[in-house]
């Protein structure tokens, strides 16, 4: 239908975020259809969250294509976004020393010891995309003034040689909603990461919370014949 025509234009980037979509009258004239058919096309786009109508202002594109990342090797968020042609940024960065929850302490074999906790909100093309909550052992000597620096954490502690990751779809907590400025009913892709150094010692535990409407992961596997 006509709705699919406009949907493809939006998904292919012919119509970008902020662009005005043809009015019902314009659609009628261009495609020689009834007012009801033209209205239905716009309604379909609106129901799928691709456009938004402003009273007396017209209909504008709100859809942003998902960032698709292939899970094949270890790289930082900055490297991921740069490779995809996006501009990475940091909305907020806070580092503290605190006693983590019991599950995190058990993961690192700690009792009541403190760890570094780093909370970051990262952006892609100035759009809020992911909220990171990371824990690191104090033995890594991460500077507490790192939030004033531009270097990545891996530049300080060294890149991991192995990571274990687990993905799940969750409903966001209040903390995640505030960080990403999303509603409680917006799905989030949760990514749990445990990183190891070359001595197979755990050096990082991170929970990543990605906006489900803007991010997806592709996993490719192959079999040797």
Regions found by a protein language model. Name each.
Residues 42-43:
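Short, hydrophobic-biased segments on the C-terminal half of alpha helices
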Residues 1-6:
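Short, small-residue-biased leader/transition segments that mark boundaries at the very start
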Residues 75, 87-225:
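C-terminal all-alpha effector/ligand-binding and dimerization domain
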Residues 14-19, 47-56, 62:
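Beta-hairpin "wing" of winged helix-turn-helix
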Residues 60-73:
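Short, cationic-aromatic polyanion-contact patches
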Residues 37:
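Residues in the helix-turn-helix
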């Amino acid at each position: 239908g006509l709705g699919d025509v406009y949907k493809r234009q939006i998904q292919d980037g012919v119509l970008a975020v902020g662009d005005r979509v043809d009015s019902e009258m314009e659609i009628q004239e261009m495609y020689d259809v009834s007012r009801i058919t033209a209205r239905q096309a716009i309604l379909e786009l609106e129901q799928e969250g691709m456009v938004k109508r402003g009273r007396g202002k017209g209909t504008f594109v709100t859809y942003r294509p998902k960032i698709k990342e292939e899970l094949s090797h270890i790289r930082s968020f900055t490297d991921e976004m740069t490779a995809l042609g996006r501009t990475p940024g940091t909305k907020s960065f806070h580092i503290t020393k605190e006693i983590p929850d019991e599950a995190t302490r058990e993961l690192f074999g700690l009792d009541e010891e403190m760890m570094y906790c780093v909370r970051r909100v990262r952006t892609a093309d100035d759009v809020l995309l992911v909220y990171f909550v990371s824990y690191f052992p104090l033995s890594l000597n991460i500077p507490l003034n790192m939030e004033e620096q531009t270097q990545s954490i891996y530049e300080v502690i060294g890149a991991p040689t192995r990571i274990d990751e687990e993905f799940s779809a969750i409903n966001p907590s209040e903390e995640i909603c505030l960080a990403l400025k999303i509603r409680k009913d917006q799905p989030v892709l949760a990514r749990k990461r445990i990183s190891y150094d070359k001595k197979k010692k755990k050096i990082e535990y991170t929970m990543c919370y990605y906006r489900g409407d803007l991010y997806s992961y592709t996993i490719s596997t192959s079999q040797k014949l």
